[in-house]
Amino acid sequence: MAKLTKKMKAIKAGVDSTKAYEINEAIAVLKQFATAKFVESVDVAVNLGIDPRKSDQNVRGATVLPHGTGREVRVAVFTQGANADAAKEAGADLVGMEDLAEQIKKGEMNFDVVIASPDAMRVVGQLGQVLGPRGLMPNPKVGTVTPNVAEAVKNAKSGQIRYRNDKNGIIHTTIGKANFSEVQLKENLQALLVALNKAKPTTAKGIFIKKVSISTTMGAGVAVDQASL
């Protein structure tokens, strides 16, 4: 068994794994142990009361966090004509059609999000084996296949996050950075939970949001008392 580092021992001693912390206290605990040489991300895990084996109970979507994620997002857009001009004006980093597809086929993938107008999906569809495994394939369910590409670019640039439950029915995503204020992190988390509640499948029974835990990149998870949200 691997030995615990000093930091891991300190975290283990300082975090009560049996306790659900009031949100401000939870954030304070995270910040206390966010001592890496880089600004750590603050991540959240939300356990949902769904049966992920049933396709009609899977949860997937996107929402814009009020305070963003703290990271710069590079956006590639597949579109043409007036939409291409609008995408560039909105801040897209890469805009094109077949020319952009050729870049991607060559392995040039310097972007974090791919957006496409519906008429461009004939081109994007050829890139499924490249974009799919990386979670980059545009999808209308998360707003990345849309006729309004300019709005989608603005959303991506302003802190939109995409979420999707894993095989255990858990949502994993980022709600900011460790240098965000307690208020910013709390409001970002609240925005995510509001979006998840709106996305609750009609077939899901019982308690929908069962557990919420937050953590930093190098830190331990801290359970959050939902009543404090």
UniProtKB/Swiss-Prot annotation:
GO BP terms in the entry: regulation of translation; translation
Keyword match tRNA processing: no
Key words, A-Z: Repressor, Ribonucleoprotein, Ribosomal protein, RNA-binding, rRNA-binding, Translation regulation, tRNA-binding
InterPro entries (alphabetical): Ribosom_uL1_bac-type, Ribosomal_uL1, Ribosomal_uL1-like, Ribosomal_uL1/biogenesis, Ribosomal_uL1_3-a/b-sand, Ribosomal_uL1_CS
GO cellular component: cytosolic large ribosomal subunit
UniProt cross-references to PROSITE patterns, sorted A to Z: RIBOSOMAL_L1
Domain of life: Bacteria
Disulfide cross-links: none
GO molecular function: rRNA binding; structural constituent of ribosome; tRNA binding
Pfam families: Ribosomal_L1
Keyword Ribosomal protein: yes
Family from the record: Belongs to the universal ribosomal protein uL1 family.
Record text on subunit structure and interactions: Part of the 50S ribosomal subunit.
NCBIfam families the UniProt entry points to: rplA_bact
Biological role stated in the UniProt entry: Binds directly to 23S rRNA. The L1 stalk is quite mobile in the ribosome, and is involved in E site tRNA release.
Protein's name according to its UniProt entry: Large ribosomal subunit protein uL1
Gene (UniProt): rplA
